[in-house]
């Protein structure tokens, strides 16, 4: 079963919580920060990120950066003493900041 949520930034905490519980979610993004990859209100299928999930540059992920939830791209990955750190940003060159893997809750597997 795929849960369905509307992504609206800070309020998208519920989607992150469901992903942390292992649920695959259909999330509808609002805004133009990811155009032309994603259009506003275009749904995606987001799977939970687990220890086995491979994260790469250009993956679209649901994550939390500085208290806000984003459906944005991984722009860069750097090794750290405890794993890796991921630079999150939109599709227009704005960088939100670096996060640890524990702040990445889901990965987009399909754009609908």
Locate predicted features:
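Extended hydrophobic leader/signal-anchor segments used for secretion and membrane insertion
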Residues: 1-112
């Amino acid at each position: 079963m795929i849960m369905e949520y509307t992504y609206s930034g800070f309020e998208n905490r519920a989607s992150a919580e469901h992903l942390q519980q292992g649920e695959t979610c259909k999330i509808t993004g609002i805004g133009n920060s990811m155009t032309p990859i994603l259009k506003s209100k275009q749904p995606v299928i987001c799977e939970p990120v687990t220890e086995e999930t491979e994260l790469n540059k250009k993956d679209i992920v649901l994550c939390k950066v500085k208290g806000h939830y984003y459906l944005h791209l991984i722009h860069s990955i750097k090794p750290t003493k405890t794993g890796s750190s991921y630079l999150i940003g939109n599709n227009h060159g704005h960088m939100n900041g670096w996060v640890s893997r524990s702040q990445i809750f889901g990965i987009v597997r399909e754009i609908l």
